[in-house]
UniProtKB/Swiss-Prot annotation:
One of its GO terms (biological process) is defense response to fungus. It comes from Arabidopsis thaliana. It is found in: Secreted. Keywords: Antimicrobial, Disulfide bond, Fungicide, Plant defense, Secreted, Signal. Disulfide bonds join 34-91, 45-74, 53-84, 72-86. InterPro entries: SCRL (IPR010682). Residues 1-24 form the signal peptide. Belongs to the DEFL family. GO terms for cellular component: extracellular region. This is Defensin-like protein 249.
Length: 92
């Protein structure tokens, strides 16, 4: 009976793993920022452009990036775009 319970629990966990790994990737939202550590986003930099870039980074990249100290620079681009540069991000 214990073996059946362990097998069932393992099956459930393994079936959830692909769902966890693909969250956000189906729509192409999660991006690898490494090695350039730069990404272009829509919108303007405004006064808090660096923080806006950091928020976008956390939204579109792996949550484990929060474990490292990060600062970002925001550079305005044409057509309501901005370049986010986060040189202190640790690439794993």
């Amino acid at each position: 009976m214990k073996l059946a319970a362990i097998f069932l629990a393992s099956s459930v966990l393994l079936s959830l793993l692909p769902i966890h790994l693909s969250q956000g990737e189906a729509a192409g939202e999660r991006r690898q920022w490494c090695p350039s550590k730069q990404q272009v986003f829509r919108g303007s930099c405004s006064d808090d452009g660096g923080q806006k870039c950091l928020n976008d980074l956390l939204w579109t990249w792996n949550p484990s990036v929060r474990l490292s100290p990060i600062y970002c620079d925001c550079t305005p681009k044409r057509h309501n775009k901005r370049l986010c540069d986060c040189p202190s991000m640790i690439c794993l």
